[in-house]
Amino acid sequence: MALEIRTSKVGFLSHDGASTIRGVVWEPARRARADGAPLRPRGVVQIVHGMAEHVERYDAFARYLVERGFIVCGEDHIGHGRSVADESRLGCLPPDGKEIMIEDVHELRTIVAARYAKATPYFIFGHSMGSFITRAYLARHGQGVAGAVICGTGQQPLLVSRAGNWLARLLCKRKGPDYRSAFLDNLGVGAYARQIKDAHTSVDWICTDPAVVDAYIADPLCGAMFSVGGYATLTDLTGEVATRACAERMPKDAPVLLVAGDKDPVGSCGVGVRKVFDQFKAAGVVDVQLKLYPGMRHEILNEPGHAEVFADVEAWMEKALP
């Protein structure tokens, strides 16, 4: 008999002081067994989504984990998904959005963790931009995290991030933070698109499955061009996590799993992901594992071979349980 799963909404005031952050919790519909005994979760998994998407795209992965005993939650960042007042604001972030997003992630963790016993293990799963947020988050609030899965990450050279940040902030001053620069966007996500030969769309780089690409394009909550304020935030993030100091502030005893496709341009087809692995090891993180999936692009949770990824992540979490 299939487990009945329910979703519930959560909302709170963003650390920008104005936006309402919208989130989702996936959990079993029943909190007690047939004999009346409470149904205790094996752990909580908080999903930190990527750029120009929203957390409900992770529904299949979340349900997979709930069926295996976990509670799953996630929120739409400022400028994303259902956390915007209207769709014209998608992709609009302030230039100081880094700290806001990190603290909003922590706010959701505080809210959801309070619902369960203190001993319930808490995992963070960050994908793409969410992987950069997660890495910066661990440097600030990593204590008490049972483990982190860093998915679809990369390692931008620090000088490149700083140059991009300088340009984005210059445009913020001249045009305002909500201005959208096709030139800056071409330097950013456009660089990923150019790495895919014989591409049919500008977002073929996210997945080898055309149906996933088409669904992304058709989703009104996906694909918005980042404002120059958004790019200032993004390059602020990539610049911070490229530093040794950031990795050294991470908890050394929390296990980390790095996963990515070996055809993912965000991770330089594995090269950048290996640099992150080496960075974590050099910083003294005791348990770091890395797995690259042959032939997969950026969204490994949506690739035709995603079942292997789901199983690998769940098995890793099971081993990380105290």
Regions found by a protein language model. Name each.
Residues 42-53, 128-129, 262-263:
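Active-site glycine-rich loops that stabilize anionic/oxyanionic intermediates
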Residues 258-260:
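Short beta-strand/loop motif that positions the catalytic acidic residue
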Residues 93-114:
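Alpha/beta-hydrolase active-site loop
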Residues 57-88:
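Conserved alpha/beta-hydrolase
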Residues 116-128:
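Alpha/beta-hydrolase fold nucleophile elbow
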Residues 283, 287-322:
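Catalytic active-site module of serine/aspartate enzymes centered on a nucleophile-bearing elbow/loop
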Residues 134-221:
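Alpha/beta-hydrolase-fold enzymes
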Residues 1-35:
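N-terminal cap/lid segment of alpha/beta-hydrolase-fold proteins
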